[in-house]
């Protein structure tokens, strides 16, 4: 399973890509693999405020419904609308086409506290 080195990771299996004062958030390949076929994604609206370690949406698969936990705090500035019609993108392209939200950071230091690719690989025994 791939774990891109340019991203940071949460213990709840979300990834974070930094773009200036904003971050892009999605779920990892490991998470989508554990969930199985994704059939529905619920995301917050643009303008919503999310808080680190708090739920901000959910992913429903044929196996279960899993909450999405915000790895950082901030204001949602964009939502991947494609996931409404094509939730299977999460399985097909978890790091590219299936990004979930873009967030304007309220505290950029939160990103540095997330796991590196190496630490995430150790946590998920994918090294």
Curated annotation (Swiss-Prot):
One term under GO cellular component: cytosol
A Pfam family the protein falls into: GCV_H
Chain positions with N6-lipoyllysine modification: 63
Entry note: cofactor: Binds 1 lipoyl cofactor covalently.
Cofactor(s) this protein requires: (R)-lipoate
Occurrences of domain Lipoyl-binding (ranges): 22-104
Gene Ontology BP term (one): glycine decarboxylation via glycine cleavage system
Keywords of the record: Lipoyl
Protein function: The glycine cleavage system catalyzes the degradation of glycine. The H protein shuttles the methylamine group of glycine from the P protein to the T protein.
Record-stated family: Belongs to the GcvH family.
Subunit and partners: The glycine cleavage system is composed of four proteins: P, T, L and H.
PANTHER family: GLYCINE CLEAVAGE SYSTEM H PROTEIN (PTHR11715), GLYCINE CLEAVAGE SYSTEM H PROTEIN-RELATED (PTHR11715:SF3)
Protein name from the UniProt record: Glycine cleavage system H protein
Gene field: gcvH
């Amino acid at each position: 399973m791939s774990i891109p080195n340019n991203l940071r990771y949460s213990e709840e299996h979300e990834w974070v890509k930094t773009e200036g004062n904003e971050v892009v958030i999605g779920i990892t390949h490991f998470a989508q693999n554990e969930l199985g076929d994704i059939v529905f994604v619920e995301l917050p609206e643009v303008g919503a405020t999310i808080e680190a370690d708090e739920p901000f949406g959910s992913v429903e698969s044929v196996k279960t419904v899993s909450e999405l936990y915000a790895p950082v705090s901030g204001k949602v500035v964009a939502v991947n609308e494609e996931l409404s019609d094509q939730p299977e993108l999460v399985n097909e392209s978890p790091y590219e086409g299936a990004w979930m939200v873009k967030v304007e950071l309220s505290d950029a230091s939160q990103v540095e506290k997330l796991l590196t690719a190496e630490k995430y690989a150790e946590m998920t025994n994918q090294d």
